[in-house]
Structure formats: structure tokens, C-alpha cells
């Protein structure tokens, strides 16, 4: 049994790259949704809700699609000491975030949602990442060369400079990049059965 058409509701080049690893054919749609974090909700609930909102916003464009596509939405945040580190607005924010992560373990939470017709499934994957200490000079070099402004927590684990400072990871590597592919794959398998 083949998969239904998959539509990735994301502008992230990393999510597209990760989903390509599945070997599945898919298309992408660009959507704009507010990524409002509700302090009354847990981090996990927030990223699941935002992923669901992205999938629901995207399905509006495909209501008359007779192929019955699966919309995939996702949202990723970094958290340390219960505080959420989103995407930095500028180099000063990126520096502040990266200084907080030095020599410490933090969590990367990605919520993803699959929406097909009226069926909605979502979950959250969490990965723990520990970074070695970086000097301020190394951090500034990273910020100036990697442009981490579209990345939660101000870094990409796959970036050449940052890869030198990741001392351990517990959980899914692809989750840290923005999409827990093995969990998405298992959820897609359930949808088609």
C-alpha cells in the first residue's frame, strides 16, 4: 500500500532535507502562522499545538484535493533550565543564547503533526544535547560564519563549526535538526494502515 501524497507545511530547508532522507515523494507549502508560546502550557504541549496549527493552516489550500494528502507541520524549540530559547533576532541575542548553553546539557523539543482529512495526530520528540565550552571568540566566529538566525537556540548541530563542540546527544539527531524522522515515519505507517 502506497503512502498518500505528503505535503510538508514548512519553509525550513533542514526539514525538507530530512524528509528527503525517507525516500518518499512530497511537496512543500509555505504557510505563515503565529508561533505563540503559551506560558501556561508545557514546552511539549506548545510545540505540538504550533505544529498542529501549521498543518491546519496548510490544509486550507488543499480542501478540494481529491488525493487526500497528509499535511505535515512541525515546530522546534531549545530549552535550558525550563526556559525556551527560540530563534535569535540578532547577533547579540544569538551570543546570549549560546553563552547559556556552554558546557551544559539542554533539550531540543520538536512537535510534529500529521493531518489527513479530519484525522489529526501529533506528538513531541525530545533530545538532550551537551555542548563543550566555547570561548566567546569561537562563539562569535560561529555566529559570523553560520548565520544561526533561523535556528532555535541559535545553532545548527549540523553546522561545520558547531559540530566540533557537541560532546553528547541522547535521542534523535534529526530531531535536533528540526524533524524526528523515525517518529514521523512510524506515525505515517500508522496513518496508511
From Swiss-Prot:
Its main location: cytoplasm. One of its GO terms (cellular component) is cytoplasm. Keywords: Cytoplasm, Hydrolase, Nucleotide metabolism. The active site is at 75 (proton acceptor). Its EC number is 3.6.1.9. One of its GO terms (biological process) is nucleotide metabolic process. Its cofactor is a divalent metal cation. It is an enzyme of class 3 (hydrolase). CDD domains: Maf (cd00555). The record marks 14, 76, 158 as: Important for substrate specificity. InterPro entries: ITPase-like_fam, Maf-like. It catalyses: dTTP + H2O = dTMP + diphosphate + H(+); UTP + H2O = UMP + diphosphate + H(+). GO terms for molecular function: dTTP diphosphatase activity; UTP diphosphatase activity. It is found in: Cytoplasm. It holds the Pfam family Maf. Nucleoside triphosphate pyrophosphatase that hydrolyzes dTTP and UTP. May have a dual role in cell division arrest and in preventing the incorporation of modified nucleotides into cellular nucleic acids. Belongs to the Maf family. YhdE subfamily. This is dTTP/UTP pyrophosphatase. It comes from Chlorobium phaeovibrioides (strain DSM 265 / 1930).
Amino acid at each position: 500500500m502506497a503512502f498518500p501524497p505528503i505535503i510538508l507545511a514548512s519553509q525550513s530547508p533542514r526539514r525538507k532535507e530530512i524528509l528527503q532522507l525517507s525516500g518518499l515523494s512530497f511537496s512543500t507549502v509555505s504557510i505563515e502562522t503565529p508561533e505563540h508560546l503559551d506560558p501556561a502550557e508545557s514546552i511539549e504541549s506548545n510545540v505540538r499545538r504550533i505544529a498542529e496549527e501549521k498543518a491546519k493552516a496548510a490544509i486550507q489550500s488543499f480542501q478540494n484535493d481529491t488525493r487526500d494528502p497528509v499535511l505535515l507541520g512541525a515546530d522546534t524549540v531549545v530549552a535550558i533550565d525550563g526556559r525556551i530559547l527560540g530563534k535569535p533576532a540578532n547577533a547579540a541575542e544569538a551570543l546570549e543564547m549560546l553563552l547559556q548553553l556552554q558546557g551544559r546539557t539542554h533539550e531540543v523539543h520538536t512537535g510534529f503533526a500529521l493531518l489527513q482529512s479530519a484525522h489529526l495526530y501529533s506528538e513531541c520528540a525530545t533530545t538532550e544535547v551537551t555542548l563543550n565550552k566555547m570561548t566567546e571568540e569561537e562563539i562569535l566566529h560561529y555566529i559570523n560564519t553560520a548565520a544561526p538566525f533561523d535556528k532555535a537556540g541559535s545553532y545548527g548541530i549540523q553546522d561545520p563549526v558547531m559540530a566540533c563542540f557537541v560532546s553528547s546527544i541522547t535521542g534523535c539527531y534529526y530531531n535536533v535538526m528540526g524533524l524526528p524522522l523515525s517518529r514521523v515515519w512510524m506515525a505515517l505507517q500508522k496513518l496508511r494502515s
